[in-house]
């Protein structure tokens, strides 16, 4: 029976519930504060789910050569995010272990947050809030904000998150999009109606 092991907690517990309800899959949660029991479970694991954030994972659970020497049955490692800082991909590849990540899983949330911060700066929301809490009582004209409407927005990166920011700014605020991303195809720039530029020009504008 395939055995999936995950460390501590997962943000999407509904995913764990789905797997646990499959009678042909064994799902085991291990605790980072119980090394002996954890590695006993990992020794017979076929898949390991681990956070992508280095500061959230004790080094002993980083998937490197030392870790892999203790997990001989492993065939898949899954990173709980777009990154994979806790996984030595080269070491896994040498052993024929598949590494997967969750690219795009939080793109919508991050994109909306980025646009929210733009609006916060343009409308001076946080700045005004802090001063009001300190007793400021000046004229409202002192804090006139600016609109995002029809502004030119510069994006460094036009992947899952950057692309979604572009869509929100265009569809919601009629913005023009400048973008720098040397790894994205011209077709994607066209699809997102973004003007391709270099980093210096983007920062200048």
Task: For each feature predicted by the language model, list its residue ranges.
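Phosphate-coordination loops involved in phosphoryl transfer and adenosine-cofactor binding
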Residues: 1, 74, 149-152
């Amino acid at each position: 029976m395939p055995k999936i092991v995950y460390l501590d907690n997962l943000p999407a517990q509904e995913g764990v519930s789905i797997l646990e309800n499959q009678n042909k899959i064994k799902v085991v949660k291990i605790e980072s504060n119980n090394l002996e029991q954890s590695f006993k479970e990992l020794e017979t694991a076929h898949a390991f789910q681990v956070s992508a954030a280095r500061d959230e994972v004790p080094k002993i659970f980083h998937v490197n050569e030392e870790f892999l020497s203790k997990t001989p049955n492993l065939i898949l490692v899954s990173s709980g995010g777009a990154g994979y800082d806790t996984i030595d991909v080269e070491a896994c590849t040498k052993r024929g272990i598949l590494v997967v990540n969750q690219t795009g899983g939080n793109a919508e949330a991050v994109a909306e947050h980025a646009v929210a911060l733009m609006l916060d700066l343009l409308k001076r929301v946080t700045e005004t809030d802090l001063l009001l809490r300190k007793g400021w009582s000046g004229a409202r004209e002192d804090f006139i904000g600016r609109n995002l409407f029809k502004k030119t927005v510069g994006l460094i990166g036009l992947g899952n998150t950057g692309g979604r920011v572009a869509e929100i700014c265009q569809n919601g605020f009629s913005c023009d999009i400048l973008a720098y991303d040397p790894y994205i195809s011209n077709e994607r720039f066209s699809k997102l109606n973004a003007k391709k530029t270099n980093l210096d020009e983007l920062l200048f504008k």
